[in-house]
From Swiss-Prot:
The lineage of its organism: Bacteria, Pseudomonadati, Pseudomonadota, Betaproteobacteria, Burkholderiales. Its EC number is 3.2.2.-. InterPro entries: Formyl_transferase-like_C_sf, MPG, MPG_sf. Pfam families: Pur_DNA_glyco (PF02245). Keywords: DNA damage, DNA repair, Hydrolase. One of its GO terms (biological process) is base-excision repair. Disulfide bonds: none annotated. This is Putative 3-methyladenine DNA glycosylase. GO terms for molecular function: alkylbase DNA N-glycosylase activity; DNA binding. NCBIfam families: 3mg (TIGR00567). Belongs to the DNA glycosylase MPG family. The keyword Secreted does not apply. The keyword Hydrolase applies. CDD domains: AAG.
Length: 213
């Protein structure tokens, strides 16, 4: 590990909950790392959404296709998809291999490699560098070459953890959808300024307060 790097340890596949919804909750407070020859970019994941089996908004809903095969890999693989012809979205496969489910990484609090991140998003305030799924991929240099990448490899683009205490997790409905909008499948870090979407949505529907992981 280079001097002064955060003590982020790679997540192993066995660390990941198999259930899609539990995986989306579990990933709040974990880290996305992109190691490059010029340095490391990393940040804490503060917002995710679950797209479980049977969800009609999931890209895997109609079964395996040439463009969505990464969603059917073992848990912890990247599924990178261009959305609306504008932005790439970074998803992670969930459930057992060949099931077809995943979670979307929606927002990150950038922590390491800020000059590298800011070079990809010039003139953008820190809060908005990776606040939203399209901004996230631009900020962290994630494109189609990472589709199918093993995020549990600890190399290149990977997910990790820093051992710390219990992390609070809020849950609300997903945003930006035209159907299946009312299920509580969006998870976030309460109080984080880096979470996307309207502030009024950041309340747990069941209790009016964030849950804990």
């Amino acid at each position: 590990m280079r001097k002064h790097q955060l003590p982020i340890l790679p997540l192993l596949r066995d660390d990941l909950p198999l259930d899609t919804v539990e995986l989306a909750r579990f990933m709040i407070g974990k880290y996305l790392v992109h190691d490059l020859p010029e340095g490391r970019m990393s940040g804490r994941i503060v917002e995710t959404e679950a797209y479980p089996l049977g969800d009609s908004t999931s890209h895997a809903f109609m079964g395996r296709r040439p463009h969505n095969g990464s969603m059917f890999l073992a848990p912890g693989h990247a599924y990178v998809r261009l959305t609306y012809g504008l932005s790439y979205m970074l998803n992670m496969s969930a459930e057992a291999e060949e099931v077809g489910a995943g979670i979307l990484l929606r927002a990150i609090e950038p922590l390491e490699g800020l000059p590298l991140i800011e070079a990809r998003r010039p003139g953008v305030p820190l809060r908005d560098l990776a606040r939203g799924p399209g901004r996230l991929t631009m900020a962290f240099g994630v494109g189609p070459s990472f589709d199918g990448w093993d995020l549990c490899s600890g190399q290149g683009l990977w997910i990790g953890v820093i051992e710390r205490g219990e992390v609070p997790v809020g849950v609300t409905t997903r945003i930006g959808l035209s159907r299946e909008m009312h299920q509580p499948l969006r998870f976030f870090e309460p109080g984080s300024a880096f979470v996307s979407g309207p502030r009024k949505l950041l309340v747990t529907p069941q209790s009016g307060a964030p849950k804990r992981a």
